[in-house]
Amino acid sequence: AKISGNFRIGAPDGLSNFVLPVVISNIQNHHPNLNIQILSLPRVFNLSRREADLAIMVTPPKKGRFVTKKIVNYNLHLAAKNTYLEKNSQIKSKNDLKNHNIIGYIPDLIFDPTLDYLSEVIPNRAPDLSSNSVAVQMQMLNLGIGVGLAHDFALAHFPDIIPILKNKINQERAFYMVRDRDDLASEQSNLIASLLDNGIKSEVKRLQSNN
């Protein structure tokens, strides 16, 4: 089926930076008349106000006229750049982290408790360097200035950032596709949703298999 027009996807910035560009490129190759927009924001999207045609979320809404479908699980591991690990004291347990610079989210700007990855690993420890953006956190890690929790699908883009304590620390979350119930009547919207679902699933799995 031919699809065309504008279609806006709201997604967390980690997914937007490290997964969606490949996914939408593949879709656009098959549907050149489709204009795909990625709205990358570290917060929950308001589909009722049509901020986006479809949203990818880590925690789906519990109320409202929405249809939710789980897409795929993803993992996070503690990680640091190889040069950082060579220059600093060894990390053999979580207790060793107290001697290291920690990189993470800005605590009071975590809009979804599910994204508070760090407090599960290092309770009562605020990050020394923080950002509300996954992409910025990855660039900090890549500079070799600290240790942080990184998405496995993002680590695939940074070969010099190495997972640490891989067998001891493994956070698992999931991405969900959230749509307005009224959009289920649109054949085009259903097709795009299906393409995104399959594309995100396969790209996350491909990237995670590199670790």
Each predicted region: which residue ranges?
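Short, surface-exposed acidic/glycine-rich loop or hinge patches that mediate macromolecular interfaces
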Residues: 14, 182-183
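Residues that form or flank phosphate/diphosphate-binding pockets in enzymes
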Residues: 18-19, 88, 113, 187
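Short amphipathic alpha-helical coupling segments at ligand-binding clamshell hinges
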Residues: 184-198, 203
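Short, well-ordered beta-strand segments
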Residues: 8-10, 55, 103, 148, ...
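C-terminal regulatory
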Residues: 49, 61-175, 202-211
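Central regulatory/effector-binding core of bacterial HTH transcription factors
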Residues: 4-64
